[in-house]
A protein has these predicted regions:
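N-terminal beta1-alpha1-beta2 submodule of the flavodoxin-like/Rossmannoid cofactor-binding fold
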Residues: 1-104
Length: 104
């Protein structure tokens, strides 16, 4: 979804500098990439506004990762063959803005 003329104007005339910020969106849809997700449509609008204001934004779909369940930061140390959570948590820690999204 494209930004409206008013949204573009507000972004372009903003006196604030957000260029040093990083945003991470976790799209908690149940649909794997590249399947269309309505949640992604909502993310795209917010992400577009952030990027127009100089914020670096990334979107991850946890469903695309192999995340082991448990209470330890890396479940491969506790019997799991694979756990992508350490990759995701590093991105979460590096982000200034974390946006959790889910289907309505």
């Amino acid at each position: 979804m494209a930004l409206s003329d008013k949204q573009i104007e507000l972004c372009e005339t903003s006196k604030w500098d957000f260029s040093d910020l990083k945003a991470l969106f976790l799209n908690c849809t149940l649909k794997r990439s590249p399947e269309m997700s309505h949640t992604q449509g909502l993310i795209d609008m917010s992400k577009g506004i952030m990027e127009k204001n100089g914020i670096t934004a990334e979107v991850l779909r946890p469903v695309d990762f192999e995340i082991a369940y448990g209470v330890w930061p890396d479940m491969t140390e506790h019997g799991w063959g694979k756990d992508d959570w350490p990759i995701i948590i590093q991105k979460v820690k590096a982000a200034d803005i974390l946006v959790l999204t889910s289907p309505i």
